[in-house]
Amino acid sequence: SPPMRRRARIDGNHVAIVQTLRDLGVSVFSTAGVGDGFPDLVCGYHGTHLLELKDGSLSPSRRRLTDDEREWHEAWLGEPVEVVESPAQAAELVEYWDRLEVSKTET
């Protein structure tokens, strides 16, 4: 029989982070249901970004990447997966993407 797929867990702040990103003009596709270590969000904003969501209100041990997530992130050859723990951190990430884009156009 095929190996059991590990069920994906949706973090409590998922909806709020997605809404924050969309409010800031980011295209967001939730991949939280994919499981097996795949990141929670695929975002389009000055390129494509993969986000892993963790609930910042949980203890650090409960926010750690799972073995599946860590293996997936390490094997991924594209832009590094960003770990986001709150809507505020998501907004900071969008500001960072804006600054990166500006610095690219200035060179």
Model-derived features: positions:
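Catalytic phosphate/metal-binding cores of nucleic-acid and nucleotide-processing enzymes, i.e., regions
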Residues: 1-107
